[in-house]
Amino acid sequence: MKGAQGEAQALAYLKQQGLTLVTQNYRCRSGEIDIIMRDHQELVFVEVKYRSGQQFGSAVEFFHPHKRRKFESAIQHYMLDNKLNPSLIAHRIDIVGIDVLSNNNDKISWLKYV
């Protein structure tokens, strides 16, 4: 499982937690936002990370500073494209990490407000 399947698993998990889907795979010249959800009145920009092995760390550890800058730039583009003022619209960045463990079970980690 990779890419689209990992995002589908993350989306299903977030829906179970009560969030509603706004859009998926928003792309712009700055990068991509995997999933955009709504949590009550707050927009949630979600980066999904999938790791099939933990020898180099867990999935959520792979949201490094360079990726974060690109992600934040993509959020700015999304806000501009949709005529949303980031100063007035509550929003946050979350990471959903999916780690496949040795027993082929998936461990989902959801970090809010990163």
UniProtKB/Swiss-Prot annotation:
InterPro entries in the record: Restrct_endonuc-II-like (IPR011335), tRNA_endonuc-like_dom_sf (IPR011856), UPF0102_YraN-like (IPR003509)
Domain of life: Bacteria
Pfam families noted in UniProt: UPF0102
Gene Ontology molecular functions: nucleic acid binding
SUPFAM superfamilies (alphabetical): Restriction endonuclease-like
TM region(s), chain numbering: none
Gene3D superfamilies per record: 3.40.1350.10
Cited PANTHER family: UPF0102 PROTEIN YRAN
NCBIfam families according to UniProt: PRK12497.1-3, YraN family protein
Family assignment from sequence similarity: Belongs to the UPF0102 family.
Protein name (database record): UPF0102 protein Patl_3694
Record organism: Pseudoalteromonas atlantica (strain T6c / ATCC BAA-1087)
Source taxonomy: Bacteria, Pseudomonadati, Pseudomonadota, Gammaproteobacteria, Alteromonadales
